[in-house]
């Protein structure tokens, strides 16, 4: 039988959430979260033990991301880091590798690729984005043999406690406040219904399930109908092409069934491109992506050539905006002006360099945001520390971040000024029940 444990969010989170945009209560197993490569979550947090470097000391930074088909923003960020700082194999600083598209089924490969970074004697930090299942197990192995390496976990897809204990720093989107604000944004954009597209595996991820529960409750409070839909998990045998084909074939029937004033949201990157294309063609609404970015799905969905604009987010967003407006999505489709995955990856690269040279502190929120700001001029990043739902303890090494929603043809929506009601900060949900409910939702899971 599954072990269940109720953990409650401290009221201390409420005050912090007035400043930003993730957390609430859930029922989770904080010992083992799915298959983690055969390793239990560490009972005690471990941190890197490194010496401050001098100018000229060798420094390599490892980056592990998904492939361009599953995680384009993170992949492009790693390539940009190589362009800026050089390839480690050619005398530069950055060593980049990718984990398999079917990382859930090929978890040992994922673990081995991350751990292999530590074989480089000049490796000083390893950054994983997105931190898919297997990341914590890999970090534990690295810590055992190379305690001097700084370990950075970005957008964790494993148990929260496990991610925090095995990493020196965890950065993620603020999904609790977004759970409310995305629904508020959808209503402001004209939606009367909200369709949440996912699959059971994603609903076993604590913060994604929590966000979904908050979205459903927010729909009740704000007068929208909440619709739960399934689409195939790309990590199953159906793969990315099959999952994308399913969304492409079903988005118009969903719009026909639920109406054009339905806001569609998906939790998977691979689903995003066909969803965007279908939403525009059908005249529906799309607030923002799971991991918002102008290049998450939009360029391919609307045939926007941005190759000569790499890293110039204002230019990229302007080109995407033209295409979206031309496709009829003005005022109905949005994103963040700067990519979360891209910004966090490059910001983390700069942060660890400053930390290794004794110029910044790894878990200092101002330092973290300053490094991200190097790539997001004009963005107003909001940050808050995650609070453990069992103990009420503020986690100094777990920072949650957010931006305002940018609506094409309209501009910023002002979601950063929306106060999230207190009830969403203290919700109690059953993680197992949410996953089981998702298994019964309309659509196919690929399992």
What residues fall within each predicted segment?
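Hinge/cleft segment of the Venus flytrap/periplasmic-binding protein
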Residues: 44-46, 317-447
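Extracytoplasmic "Venus flytrap"
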Residues: 42-111, 127-133
């Amino acid at each position: 039988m599954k072990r269940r444990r109720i953990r409650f969010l401290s009221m201390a989170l409420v005050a912090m959430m007035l400043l930003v945009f993730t957390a609430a209560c859930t029922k989770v197993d904080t010992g083992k979260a799915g298959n983690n490569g055969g390793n239990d979550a560490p009972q005690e947090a471990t941190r890197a033990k490194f010496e401050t470097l001098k100018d000229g000391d060798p420094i390599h930074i490892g980056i592990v991301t998904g492939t361009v088909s599953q995680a384009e923003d993170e992949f492009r960020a790693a390539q940009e880091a190589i362009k800026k700082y050089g390839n480690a194999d050619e005398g530069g600083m950055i060593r980049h590798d990718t984990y398999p598209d079917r990382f859930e089924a090929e978890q040992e490969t994922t673990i081995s690729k991350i751990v292999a970074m530590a074989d480089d004697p000049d490796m000083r930090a390893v950054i994983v984005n997105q931190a898919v299942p297997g990341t914590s197990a890999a970090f534990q192995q690295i810590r055992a043999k190379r305690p001097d390496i700084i370990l950075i976990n970005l957008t964790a897809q494993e148990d929260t406690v496990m991610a925090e204990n095995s990493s020196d720093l965890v950065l993620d989107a603020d999904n609790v406040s977004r759970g409310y604000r995305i629904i508020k944004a959808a209503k402001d954009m004209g939606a009367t219904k909200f369709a949440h597209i996912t699959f059971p595996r994603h609903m076993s991820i604590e913060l994604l399930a929590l966000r979904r529960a908050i979205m459903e409750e927010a729909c009740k409070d704000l007068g929208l109908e909440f619709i739960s839909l399934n689409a195939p998990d790309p990590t199953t045998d159906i793969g990315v092409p099959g999952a994308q084909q399913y969304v492409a074939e079903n988005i118009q029937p969903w719009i026909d069934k639920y109406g054009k004033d339905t806001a569609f949201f998906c939790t998977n990157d691979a689903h995003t491109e066909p969803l965007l294309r279908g939403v525009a063609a059908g005249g529906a609404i799309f607030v923002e992506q799971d991991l918002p970015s102008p290049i998450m799905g939009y360029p391919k969905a609307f045939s926007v050539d941005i190759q000569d604009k790499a890293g110039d987010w204002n230019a990229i967003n302007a080109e995407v905006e033209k295409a979206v407006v031309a496709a009829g999505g003005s005022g109905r489709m949005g994103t963040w002006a700067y990519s979360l995955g891209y910004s966090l990856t490059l910001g983390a690269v700069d942060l660890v360099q400053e930390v290794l040279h004794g110029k910044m502190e790894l878990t200092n929120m101002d330092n973290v945001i300053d490094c991200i700001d190097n790539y997001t001029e004009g963005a107003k990043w909001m940050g808050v520390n995650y609070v453990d739902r069992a103990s009420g303890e503020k986690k100094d090494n777990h920072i949650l971040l957010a931006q305002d929603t940018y609506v094409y043809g309209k501009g910023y929506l002002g979601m950063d000024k929306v106060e999230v009601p207190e009830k969403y900060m203290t919700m109690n949900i059953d993680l197992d029940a949410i996953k089981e409910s998702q298994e019964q939702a309309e659509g196919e899971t690929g399992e």
